[in-house]
Amino acid sequence: NSARADLCVALAKHTGMSPERMMVADVFSHRFYKIYQLEESLSSILDRDDIFIYEVSGRSAIGENSREDVVLPIYLRERTPARDYNNSYYGLMLFGHPLLVSVPRDRLSWDALYHILLYRLSRYVTRPSSDDEDDGDEKDIEDKDNIPKPGHVAGASSQDSGAGSGGAQLWSRRRKPAPVDNSPGPSHWPQRARRKHLFTLQTVNSNGTSDRSTFNEDTHAQPYIAIDWEPEMKKRYYDEVEAEGYVKHDCVGYVLKKAPVRLQECIELFTTVETLEKENPWFCPTCKQHQLATKKLDLWMLPETLIIHLKRFSYTKFSREKLDTLVEFPIRDLDFSEFVIKPQNESAPELYKYDLIAVSNHYGGLRDGHYTTFACNKDSGQSDYFDDNSVSPVTENQIESKAAYVLFYQRQDVARRLQPQPSSSDPPASPACGSPPNSEFMDVN
């Protein structure tokens, strides 16, 4: 259960960077999904997550900016044709990797920020030549709106414009407002400010859009800045190959096979104390305020028939996906005795043990799919595979698969009570597992 600080200290040994200048962020779909604070736990990071480490000047925390520096999250966007809204918002589509840029507090003007970002992007952005500058001067003299005014994006709709309070001030804090750029307007700026600008700047929310409905009601919230490129300018000056390139470390070549998860581990996690994150606080009925808290679920009594629903779908702010992790579950003797906080009868262990009687499988994705079932005949003990109108016998080692979605267990004392008593004339019962099914009717891969 390491914190961000532990990760930064470990990385400092390999990189020589100061851990105080590191910031850790979870990046998904060209956005910051989460920016980790100094003592925040990293336990929520999954194997499939893309974790970025940034080096910034000053103190390395979004919410703990020094008096001299402000750390700004920066997104890259490209204007798309108005008819293409499949992956864009108001004709602006995110691309590339987001940035965290430390900006001196006394340089919080749009013109200064433009040149700071141009410098930060210098590894993969070509500066205009003198001829380009001359061409840009002629065009900008005719159309001064091309200069990156505070919060303005040329050609954007009124909904996507930064006009108003969202674009007039780059940074404000509840305790002490930062200086606001009160420099003269574009018509009074020196001639160099009317040179050809490669991109424009826009205040956005954490999703990378300017939709006011998704802004936090707190006007002092952390600002995000978008660098908006016109397609022709991006193609001409932005080296996308260089920007997406990276040095592959030797350890990256070893792809670990996704380890299966035991059902017992899932139950342990289900009953473990959970610390609620800041984004999911608990509402206290006494003080009527949201508070940081812990949560724990316990088992008080056990039912005769236990239904376990495996979490097969993952939902985040930006995506939904199907989880295909193999969960290993026992066919018999699933023991819950250690998870019950009020034992009913310690001398009767069958009150806490379960045997599997059925499994519901799901194939497909979130929007559509196909369901099949494994079920055990209570009289014969034979397990069968049900797929629409076909039924096939299966062996126990065929029941466990990545498609398992809902597990049905029966308590052992109930199973014994319901089991028919064979007479002396009855033939012996069939074994618990039959012969393998015909492959023509069954597919459990």
From Swiss-Prot:
Enzyme Commission number(s) of this protein: 3.4.19.12
A Pfam family reported for this protein in Swiss-Prot or TrEMBL: UCH
Gene this protein is translated from: USP11
Biological process terms in GO annotation: protein deubiquitination; proteolysis
Subunit structure and binding partners: Monomer. Interacts with RANBP9/RANBPM. Interacts with BRCA2. Interacts with CHUK/IKKA. Interacts with NFKBIA. Associated component of the Polycomb group (PcG) multiprotein PRC1-like complex.
GO function term, MF aspect, one: cysteine-type deubiquitinase activity
Source taxon at top rank: Eukaryota
Record-listed Phosphoserine modification sites: S130, S430
All residue ranges annotated as the USP domain in the record: 1-412
Function: Protease that can remove conjugated ubiquitin from target proteins and polyubiquitin chains. Inhibits the degradation of target proteins by the proteasome. Cleaves preferentially 'Lys-6' and 'Lys-63'-linked ubiquitin chains. Has lower activity with 'Lys-11' and 'Lys-33'-linked ubiquitin chains, and extremely low activity with 'Lys-27', 'Lys-29' and 'Lys-48'-linked ubiquitin chains (in vitro). Plays a role in the regulation of pathways leading to NF-kappa-B activation. Plays a role in the regulation of DNA repair after double-stranded DNA breaks.
Predominant cellular place of this UniProt entry's protein: nucleus
Positions of region (Disordered): 127-194, 416-445
Name of the protein in its database record: Ubiquitin carboxyl-terminal hydrolase 11
Family: Belongs to the peptidase C19 family.
Coiled coil regions, renumbered to chain: none
UniProt biased composition (Low complexity): 420-439
Keyword Ribosomal protein annotated: no
PROSITE patterns recorded: USP_2 (PS00973), USP_3 (PS50235)
